[in-house]
Amino acid sequence: MGSLRVPTQKSKLRDMSAGEVIKAYKRWAPVYDATFGRIVKAGVKQATARANGFSGRLLEAGVGTGLALPHYGPQLSVTGIDLSSDMLRLAQLRTHKAGAKNIEALVEMDACNMSFADASFDIAVAMFVLTVVPEPQKAMAELARVTKPGGTVLVVNHFSVGGGVRGAIEKGLAKHATKLGWRPEFPLDTVLACEKLRLVSLKTIRPMDFFTMLEFRRIA
């Protein structure tokens, strides 16, 4: 299967530091599930369903409060990382309450600079995180690095449309990116530049069509 052709939109990303992200999610952590849980529910459901078609070691980068953790099948050994210790504490509580036996580790770590060895995982998943990390293209390169050749990288994310009412709203919100803790303006081409990843599937997440799921294959 050849690489998919997708329309690209060029724009400059708003800078966000690791410190700003940590500060923002310290505020969001106590209310994240209540405010964003329903919004991301469909994306979590579809991404974990796809991930459950695989087996082996799985990395979830930007695991957050662990919304996805109870949904991974027992054939997957899951490691989750997040930059926010406040979010990770909630993920640990969720794992304990769910009695999830296949969670190998939950670690405070920067997705842009992971300490894992090359080719450590069979599949890597990044949901709702690439608009958050300080250097999204570096995060994509790291996801490729830690995934085995022939392995899979799944991305679920919001991508800006650049026009219309939604585009105007995204542009208006963009100046508040630091307080929000994510970039409302985030073009699709940002995640397509990694030479080690080949896009094999692109799917809009219904019902709201606000998120998109991308499946990449790790090139040997």
Model-derived regions: residue spans:
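N-terminal, positively charged/glycine-rich alpha-helical extensions of SAM-dependent methyltransferases
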Residues: 1-28
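C-terminal alpha-helical "lid/dimerization" subdomain adjacent to the S-adenosyl-L-methionine
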Residues: 12-15, 19, 36-38, 154-213
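Class I SAM-dependent methyltransferase Rossmann-like catalytic core
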Residues: 26-37
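Conserved alpha-helix/loop element of class I SAM-dependent methyltransferases that forms part
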Residues: 38-56
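Class I SAM-dependent methyltransferase SAM/SAH-binding core
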Residues: 57-113
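A short acidic, Gly/Pro-enriched loop at the edge of an enzyme's catalytic core
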Residues: 112-123
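A short SAM/SAH-binding and catalytic strip from SAM-dependent methyltransferases
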Residues: 123-135
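A short glycine-rich, Lys/Arg-flanked "PGG" loop and its adjoining helix->strand segment in the class I
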Residues: 137-149
